[in-house]
C-alpha cells in the first residue's frame, strides 16, 4: 500500500498539507483520519476545506456527528465519530446515503465505526512527536493513489 509520511511542525503546516490533499479529494469517497485527542485531525480537515475554497469557520462536528459542505458539484461531509456509542448508530445517521452519494466523506475517529464503514480510499494517521506531528497517509485504492500523487 503506497504511503507518504510528513513531519508537520505547526498548525499552518497541517492546514497546508490538508490544502494539498484537497487538490485531488474529489476522486475519493472515503478518507479516514486517526489520532489522539488534539492531534490535529480537525486542523487537517480545515486545511482541506480551505483548499477547496471554504472561507468560513470549520468546527469539529463532535456533537452533530456530520458537517456538510458543498463546492459546486462536490459534496464534502466531515464526520467526527468520537462520541459515537454504537457503530449501529451510523445507520440512523444515513451513513450509507453519504457514502453512496456524489461526495467525499472525511471521517475522524473512524475506528469507532469498525466493521460498519467500508475500507477507505485513504487512511491517515496523525501522531504527536517532540517536534510536532507525524502524518502517515496510506492509500488503499487506485483513487486514493491519485490523491497521494498530489503530495509528491
Question: Where do the language-model regions lie?
Answer:
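P-loop (Walker A) phosphate-binding loop of NTP-binding proteins
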Residues: 34-36
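N-terminal pre-Walker A segment at the start of P-loop NTPase domains
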Residues: 1-18
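Conserved lysine of the Walker
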Residues: 41
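Short hydrophobic/aromatic beta-strand immediately N-terminal to the Walker A/P-loop
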Residues: 30-32
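Short phosphate-coordinating micro-motif centered on Lys-Gly-acidic
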Residues: 2-5, 50, 85-90, 96-152
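Short beta-strand-centered segment that lines the nucleotide-binding/catalytic pocket of NTP-utilizing
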Residues: 54-70
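Phosphate-binding P-loop
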Residues: 21-28
Amino acid at each position: 500500500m503506497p504511503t507518504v509520511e510528513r513531519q508537520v511542525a505547526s498548525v499552518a503546516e497541517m492546514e497546508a498539507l490538508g490544502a494539498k490533499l484537497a487538490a485531488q479529494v474529489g476522486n475519493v469517497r472515503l478518507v479516514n483520519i486517526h489520532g489522539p485527542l488534539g492531534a490535529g485531525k480537525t486542523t487537517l480537515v480545515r486545511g482541506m476545506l480551505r483548499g477547496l475554497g471554504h472561507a468560513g469557520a470549520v468546527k469539529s462536528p463532535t456533537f452533530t456527528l456530520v458537517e456538510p459542505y458543498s463546492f459546486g458539484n462536490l459534496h464534502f461531509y466531515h464526520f467526527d465519530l468520537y462520541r459515537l456509542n454504537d457503530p449501529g448508530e451510523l445507520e440512523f445517521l444515513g451513513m450509507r446515503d453519504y457514502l453512496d452519494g456524489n461526495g467525499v466523506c472525511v471521517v475522524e475517529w473512524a475506528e469507532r465505526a469498525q466493521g460498519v464503514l467500508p475500507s477507505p480510499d485513504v487512511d491517515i494517521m496523525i501522531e504527536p512527536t517532540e517536534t510536532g506531528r507525524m502524518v502517515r497517509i496510506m492509500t488503499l485504492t487506485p483513487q486514493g493513489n491519485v490523491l497521494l500523487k498530489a503530495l509528491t
